Amino acid sequence: MFLSPGXGPATEGGGLGPGEEAPKKKHRRNRTTFTTYQLHQLERAFEASHYPDVYSREELAAKVHLPEVRVQVWFQNRRAKWRRQERLESGSGAVAAPRLPEAPALPFARPPAMSLPLEPWLGPGPPAVPGLPRLLGPGPGLQASFGPHAFAPTFADGFALEEASLRLLAKEHAQALDRAWPPA
């Protein structure tokens, strides 16, 4: 076989022939980091169904602000983890493999009912400057206007409160301030 100069494979001549493109660097996706809220919602959906249909996955993806393909891959990985745990538990006989406790179901729609005790220096008292409201704690008039969750922690059992709950707390706080200190 006879080759004319420049008609050989690209590796021989060191250059690219007409119509050939340089090999593209393969794009590698970064690992997805899920928020606590996303993981909680995904785990709840997994408890309901290990094989959700595409409609359910799309709904869940919209709810947790993830692409549907990320939700689909999460379910594939979660099923693999579940099968691995099942094998370990059934293969070990009476001694089951130690498992981490499941995440508790948190009532994200409403704030927690528990309240934190106030430190003595945060309690109600006379204002530092007469005529100005005390800024480090609720005054006597505000105490009753706050609900039972007024001084609730921002974390419940290690989970951050959902954005809607925080907005509700902020709205209630603003309303309480409006009732206690009307603009002059």
Curated annotation (Swiss-Prot):
GO biological process, one term: positive regulation of transcription by RNA polymerase II
Alphabetic keyword roster: DNA-binding, Homeobox, Nucleus, Sensory transduction, Transcription, Transcription regulation, Vision
Disulfide bond entries: none
Keyword DNA-binding listed: yes
Residue segments, region Disordered: 1-31
A Pfam family recorded for this sequence: Homeodomain
DNA-binding region ranges: 27-86
Compositional bias segments (type: Low complexity): 1-10
Gene Ontology MF term list: DNA-binding transcription factor activity, RNA polymerase II-specific; RNA polymerase II cis-regulatory region sequence-specific DNA binding
InterPro entries: HD, Homeobox_CS, Homeodomain-like_sf, RAX/RAX2
GO cellular component, one term: nucleus
Subcellular location: Nucleus
Stored PANTHER family: HOMEOBOX PROTEIN, PUTATIVE-RELATED (PTHR46271), RETINA AND ANTERIOR NEURAL FOLD HOMEOBOX PROTEIN 2 (PTHR46271:SF2)
Function: May be involved in modulating the expression of photoreceptor specific genes. Binds to the Ret-1 and Bat-1 element within the rhodopsin promoter.
UniProt comment concerning the protein's domains: The Homeobox transactivates the Ret-1 element in the presence of CRX and NRL.
Known partners and oligomeric status: Interacts with CRX.
Name of the protein: Retina and anterior neural fold homeobox protein 2
Organism field: Pan paniscus
